[in-house]
């Protein structure tokens, strides 16, 4: 059986054209969160990520749905399970992964890690601003 986003948003006999693009974008966002979290889980389980890891698997819809209702200029804070919110606000997945791997190229130069990832440029203030250095220029 083939599952695709087009099959999920297009039902024969119903005109969903007004909502199809929104549904497609939402499903793509949820899928991006799930794939990112599964990759993080795998890396963490193999000992390639240090510290703690709080995944948001199962919470993809709430993160993407909440961020979909925001304007681009809105700011968010999140919880310790904030990867989905970060993705929902438009974060670059490569920089997010670099942050979780404690790399200098991460959003907080590798110092924020999983729980405190932040990106002022996209309006993501992180879960605990006091412990992160917001840096949107690097």
What does each of the following model-derived ranges do?
Residues 1-62, 68:
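Conserved acidic/glycine
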Residues 38-41, 48-133:
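Cofactor-binding active-site loop characterized by glycine-rich and histidine/acidic residues
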Residues 134-138:
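Positively charged, low-complexity/disordered segments
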